[in-house]
């Protein structure tokens, strides 16, 4: 199991991203718009820098829903390889069977 604090921190970051996503998108569009004057684009850059860092989507870490493990994460299943193996052996993941040939 991952540390509870790491899992909770990631949950907090996900909430911040959801809250600030629209504002970040607007500011980034202003910054990237070449037709606007440079002063206005610079002001948008400063406003973007004032937003919390954890509100950026790149700060989110994919973690296993079962264990909180950050590595060996399968996006489709939202769990790590270890949790997948354990639940697969118990027959709790539909369609997963032990291989034999």
UniProtKB/Swiss-Prot annotation:
Entry-linked InterPro entries: Ribosomal_uS14, Ribosomal_uS14_bac/plastid, Ribosomal_uS14_CS
Keyword annotations: Ribonucleoprotein, Ribosomal protein, RNA-binding, rRNA-binding
GO-annotated cellular components: cytoplasm; small ribosomal subunit
An annotated Gene Ontology molecular function: rRNA binding
Gene3D superfamilies membership: 1.10.287.1480
GO biological process: translation
Disulfide cysteine pairs (residue numbers): none
PROSITE patterns: RIBOSOMAL_S14
PANTHER family the UniProt entry points to: 30S RIBOSOMAL PROTEIN S14 (PTHR19836), SMALL RIBOSOMAL SUBUNIT PROTEIN US14M (PTHR19836:SF19)
Quaternary state and interactors: Part of the 30S ribosomal subunit. Contacts proteins S3 and S10.
Protein family membership: Belongs to the universal ribosomal protein uS14 family.
Entry-linked NCBIfam families: PRK08881.1 (NF006477)
Function recorded in the entry: Binds 16S rRNA, required for the assembly of 30S particles and may also be responsible for determining the conformation of the 16S rRNA at the A site.
Protein name listed in UniProt: Small ribosomal subunit protein uS14
Species this protein is from: Rhizobium meliloti (strain 1021)
Lineage: Bacteria, Pseudomonadati, Pseudomonadota, Alphaproteobacteria, Hyphomicrobiales
Gene: rpsN
């Amino acid at each position: 199991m991952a540390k509870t604090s790491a899992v909770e921190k990631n949950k907090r970051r996900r909430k911040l991203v959801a809250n600030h996503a629209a504002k970040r998108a607007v500011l980034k569009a202003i910054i990237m718009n070449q037709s606007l004057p440079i002063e206005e684009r610079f002001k948008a850059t400063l406003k973007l820098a004032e937003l919390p860092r954890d509100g950026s989507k790149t700060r989110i870490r994919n973690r296993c829903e079962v264990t909180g493990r950050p590595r060996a994460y399968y996006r489709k299943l939202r769990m790590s390889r270890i949790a997948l193996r354990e639940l697969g052996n118990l027959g709790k993941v539909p369609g997963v069977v032990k291989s034999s040939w």
